[in-house]
Amino acid sequence: MMINETRILNEFIELVSVPCPRKDEKAKADLLVQKLQAMGLEVKVDDAGRKIGGTTGNVWAFLPGNVGGAAGLFFEAHMDSVPPTTGTKVVRRDGVLYSDGTTTLGGDDKVGIAAGSSAGSAGAEYPAWRYPAVFYDCRRDRLFGSGQS
């Protein structure tokens, strides 16, 4: 099985278009929930955001495998990014993605989210995989969100 490079690049570009400063990751969480549920993953959002004064909790996703003893994969990423990320425009030069210079790219950690989400999509296509994932809120702020689950 191969990860679809076009899919993961498009996923990343879509993710960087959604601003997600620390403690205000609701738009990103809502997008993730929608995408993961559309792939057939079981999804829940916990109440970690309430505990830290944020707008969302951690997003948990799980895709049960259908083959006993099959290996599983676990993905973890955080949803917040170093500002400024509002209005990010992605530029591709020589096969490398950059911001246009007016904002940060937000690769930390939208790369992790894109990888996890794309693997979830691939896992839905190959159901022998077991796929647990968690996307933390407010990771940049002393791991607040990840410590509240």
Which residues does each predicted region cover?
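Short amphipathic alpha-helical segments, especially helix-boundary/capping motifs
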Residues: 5-10, 36-37, 90-95
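Active-site metal-coordination/substrate-binding segment of hydrolases
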Residues: 29, 55, 62, 69-130, ...
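N-terminal capping segment at the start of a domain
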Residues: 2-23
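A non-catalytic alpha/beta surface segment that caps or lines the substrate-entry region
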Residues: 21-69
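Short, contiguous, pocket-lining structural segments
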Residues: 4, 24, 28, 108
